[in-house]
Every structure is written in structure tokens, then in C-alpha cells.
Amino acid sequence: MITGRDIYDVLAAIVPLYVAMFLAYGSVRWWGIFTPDQCSGINRFVAVFAVPLLSFHFISTNDPYSMNYRFLAADSLQKLVILAALAVWHNLLSRYRRNGGAAASLDWTITLFSLSTLPNTLVMGIPLLRAMYGDFSGSLMVQIVVLQSVIWYTLMLFLFEYRGAKALISEQFPPDVGASIASFRVDSDVVSLNGREALQADAEVGRDGRVHVVIRRSASASTTGGGGGAARSGVSRAYGASNAMTPRASNLTGVEIYSLQTSREPTPRASSFNQADFYAMFSGSKMASQMASPMAQHGGAGGRAQGLDEQVTNKFASGKAADPPSYPAPNPGMMPAPRKKELGGSNSNSNKELHMFVWSSSASPVSEANLRNAVNHAASTDFASAPPPAAVPVGGATPKGVSGSVTPAAKNGGGELEIEDGLKSPAAGLAAKFPVSGSPYVAPRKKGGGADVPGLAEAAHPMPPTSVMTRLILIMVWRKLIRNPNTYSSLIGLVWSLVSFRWNIQMPSIIKGSISILSDAGLGMAMFSLGLFMALQPKIISCGKTVATFAMAVRFLTGPAVIAATSIAIGLRGVLLHVAIVQAALPQGIVPFVFAKEYNCHPQILSTAVIFGMLIALPITILYYVLLGI
């Protein structure tokens, strides 16, 4: 039976934490003691030193050889059951969406998993459960913290990076290319696919038709080359988040190349380029020169506001070598359009050429600048004497999935360049595969002018093989983990506890005192940092009352209900069952909110769950405590 003294002991353990939180809130919102920059410094100290050392203190002093594995199994089973249910729900609704129904989102799967399974065990759970059920429950909470740090937060990172990888592939690759990606290589300075930094994907298509992608940060680059018929570098100047998008000749003879490079940041304005400003033609000795020729956007102001600017190769049969003219280049409108017989005739060397394709989304801040400045030079004349490669069949047929022959023709009324399939090859579907306007995230337009159901393009966008995606995600998760101080504190604390409790080794007093002086302040500083965060938010409930109510129901009802079922299934009874249910009803954890904010995945919902949940958590947990004790 719960007595008044028991309730007072719980309040005595928890109220000081709320005092620290409200002092921080008042220091910013009412008294103006701290500026936002100062708050950022305090939060940085808490994230780098206070909380990691607090985690180390609890984990290193917990005996891993006396862990309650049934309790941990019940907690883990709760998370797995909820994750499996959300996965089934997401797959069913995703299938329904592809049939034209309501949209389902991976974002909601991640958010609901965070809300229902990841409470604030470290800061709130340990002192609260100790006050309710004794010191043994505090030890159980430490065991939960270990699993959260090592397994569940890592799983969250995996899901977020998977989400980022899907978005990157959907945004930067046409649908028919995504499934052909055979490998990813990520530059060492790319830490995450969270979309906060501008990235570009540079892809090459091999003889087998598989795409090999290099992901790197966008960076402004301006390189020029010289020297007669030698291969020259293109020139590209980025706009906004600068990004080099220069089409480059491959060092593999007969290999067709896609250079797909776009930023993941939105463009500040629509493109307003003039195709005549950046048209250039270079000829090589006894070969048909390749040029990156942009296809103009849809005519009129409305067409220019569409989403995709494409540059497609133009092939021109030429005679003797001529020195490439200097920029600015001739106006394409004044140039005669090559005839089909010139491209496919017996005297044409077009089958020995290197085909280039640059796909640039105007959703990128660099697309306009690239369309204004991209210049492509012909490759060395060594390619002219090479035999026709297997990847480019004799007769002019272009393999499926790579660029076709596109030539500038007479302008239509809107100022567009007509696409001419001079070889009548399977590449006739190029315009459909790489639409002139729109992006993989935008549903295709109907003939009547209306758009199809939103989200269809994203839903139907094929992904690379599972092994390729898994390797990419593991690389990004590893890079995130090795930059997180909590990773080191949790692992080092776990290793030390295994050693110290196995051989009864005590930590040197100097090291122990150095850690304690900061870890003792960790609990209060964590709550103080949470109060600063609350004060800096414009509203406590930032996601709307309906969504906030739903989030609170998931947090305080769904989680405890599921863990009650899994605990009973595992065989927990009595006080252990009560501890499992109450810890599932703790307020929302802070780490899931940090992830949601970083990856821009429903941050308003998680913010409300942290702030508002902290305010109502104390009466709710006490209510659970009283009801379970009856």
C-alpha cells in the first residue's frame, strides 16, 4: 500500500530536478540572464562533458554480472514488437499509396518508435525509480541505459541514415538509375546524410550497366585546361551552396558516364538561364565531338519555375580538327541542326565516342550557375581510333539506361530545344526517363495538365540492392558514432565495469575524483540545459494540440501497455513488473529529439513531447505508482 510518506520521498527526489529546469527557464524567458549564444555554450558543455561523464559514472559502478536478463528481455521485446508493428503498418500503407491512396511515411515510423519506446531513463528514471522502489530499481535503470546507448540509439541512427539515403537517391537519381547502383563511396569529410550539408553524387556507369557513385560535399571549383586536342576540364561556378558539376571524360574507353551532381539544399530562386549564353562546340580530329548541351526549360515564366534542368549530349559529325573556339561560344540558334544521316551514316565515327550526360536538378542552389557556366570539351583524339566498344553497339543503338542522341533543332514557340532520336534506338524513352521538368520527388503531370497523386514518384522510386544500401548506412552510422562522446563514455564504462567487478579492481582515487566532480553536476546540468531549451522555444506546444495529444497518448499509454504485455509474457511479476511499467511511462528522452532535429524528422512533435511531457510526467508516473501499488 502506497502511503503519504512514499509520495513525499518521490517528490523529494524529483522536485530538485524541476527546480533546476525552471531556474534555467526563468533565466532566459523572464530575467534575461543568458543570451542564446551563452545557452548554446552551456548546452555544448552538457553534451560533451556533463552527460557523458554522468553515463560513465552510472555504467561503471553497475555490476554487469548481476544484470536481470529477464527484465532486459522484456524491455527489448517491447521495442521489437513496436518496431515490427510499425514496419508492417508502414509497408501496408506504402503499398496502398502506390495504388493512389493515402501516404505513408518512414518519418512517422521513426517518430512513433521514438515516442513509444525511448524514455528519459538516465536523467529522470534513475532518481525517480530509486525513490519509488529502492536502490535495486536504480540498478535496473542503469542496465536500460546501457542497452539504450549501445543498441537502441544506434538503431535510431541506422533508421535516420536509411531515411537520408533514400532521400538522396530519390532526389539525385532518375528512377531507372537507382536500382542499378552497385556501390557507394563516401568522402571522408561527409559525416551524415541528414540533409543539413550540401552533397553531390558523382556517378559512373560501367560496361555492365551498373552505376558506381561517389558522395562528396559540394564545393566550388573552377578548373581549366588547355592544349589543342587534349581533353579539357569543364568550368562550373556554384551559386549559393557552391557545387562543382563539371562533366568529365572517363579514363575508361567506351564507358558511358552519368555525372549526376546536385545539392540537397533548396534553390533560392528559379533558374532563368539563356541557352545561348553557354553553348559551345569543340571539334576533334576525325571524330564526332561531344558537347554538354542544355535542354531549355519549359517556355514561359511558368515553365521556368519547374524543377529540372537537363544537359544532354549532342553529337556533331565533323571533318578536320579545328582549334576550339574561346568562350563565349556561338549561338545555337544560328547553328544548323545535324541531320539524322550524319549521325547514323556509314562515314560517322559516332560509335567510337564517349557519351556524356549531366543531370542537374534546379532544386539545387547550384543548378542555375551550372547551366550558365558548364562547358564540356571533347576527349583526346585517342578515342577516335579506338574500336567500337561493347557498351556502344555498332549501328548507333544506345544501351538501355544510358544517354541517347539529342540534337538542337529549330526552336518551338516556348524556346525549347527539340529532342531528336536520330538513331531510332531504345533511347527514345530518354525524355520520359529524364523529364525536362520536374524531379523524382514530383509526381508526373497528366496530359490534361493536372498532377497525379502526390508521392507516387517517391513511392515507386526503386532503391539499390539491400547489401549496397546496408553498407552505405553502416558507413554513415559508424562516422556518427565515433564523433559522439556518449559512445565512448558508455563503452569505456561498460568495459571498466566488466574488468573491475571481475577482478575486484578499484579505480584510482585521482581519476575517480576527477570524474565525480563533473558527473555529480551532470544530473542538475542536464535538467538546467533542458530548461534553457524550453525557454528558447517559441511555444511549449509547437505541433498543434491534436498532434500533441496524440503524442502524449503514445508516450504515456502505448509504451506502458506494450511493456506490460511483454513483461507478463516473459514472466515478470510483482515489483519487477511495476518497475517495467513505470519506467515506460517516463517523459520523452532527449536524445531522440536531438536526432529528430538534426535529421528534420518531426522535430516539433519530439520537442513538444520533451517539454510538455516533462511537465506532466511527474503526476502521471505518480499515478501509475499509486495504481500499481493498490
From Swiss-Prot:
Gene Ontology molecular function, alphabetical: auxin efflux transmembrane transporter activity; identical protein binding; protein homodimerization activity
Membrane-spanning segments: 7-27, 39-59, 71-91, 109-129, 140-160, 491-511, 515-535, 550-570, 575-595, 610-630
Tissues where the protein occurs: Expressed in roots, leaves, shoot apex and panicles. Expressed in roots, stem bases and young panicles.
Membrane topology designation: Multi-pass membrane protein
Binding site for (indol-3-yl)acetate: V51, N120, L122, Y153, I590, V591
Keyword terms of this UniProt record: Auxin signaling pathway, Membrane, Transmembrane, Transmembrane helix, Transport
Any one GO biological process: auxin-activated signaling pathway
Topological domains, Cytoplasmic: 28-38, 92-108, 161-490, 536-549, 596-609
Localization per record: Membrane
Extracellular domain ranges by topology: 1-6, 60-70, 130-139, 512-514, 571-574
Region Disordered: start-end pairs: 317-350
Composition skew (Pro residues), residue ranges: 325-335
Gene Ontology annotations for the cellular component aspect, listed alphabetically: auxin efflux carrier complex; endoplasmic reticulum; plasma membrane
NCBIfam families: 2a69
Function: Acts as a component of the auxin efflux carrier. Involved in the basipetal polar auxin transport which contributes to the spreading growth of the tillers.
Misc. comment: Plants over-expressing PIN2 exhibit reduced height, increased tiller number and enlarged tiller angle.
Assembly and oligomerization: Homodimer.
Family: Belongs to the auxin efflux carrier (TC 2.A.69.1) family.
Protein name: Auxin efflux carrier component 2
Organism (species): Oryza sativa subsp. japonica
Gene expressing this chain: PIN2
